[in-house]
Amino acid sequence: MVAADAQTALTFSLTPGQAGDAPAGRELLRQLPDLPARCRLLMDCAYEGNETRQLAFDLGFIPVVPPHPLRAEPWKVKKAWYRRRNEIERLFRRLKGFRRIFSRFDKLDVMFMAFLCFALVVEALR
């Protein structure tokens, strides 16, 4: 999921449980509409790979993700920017408040995604 803030999801996709996050995240970045130039992209540590960071730069974003501690050439991250990532985590927490999402009652992907869309609309209206 790519979210603008604690209430606004821009895009999301459903992937198998064994699939890696980074390839799906790169695909979501490619699907984003045109956003203001040089806006910050707060990413989870799973997306700190070179390919994902380079794609973010190519699309005009400033990737904000801490480097892996064992990286040979780490980069600097402004901790104040990365702390804002908790806004996105709060969106995930509120979505998990919908029992149907966290327990995965739906057997079909289309039904799960439909309810996720409904839950996102409800959260945006709060």
Show the residue positions of the predicted features.
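Short acidic-glycine loop/turn motifs at beta-strand connectors
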Residues: 2-6
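Short, mixed charged/polar active-site loops
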Residues: 9
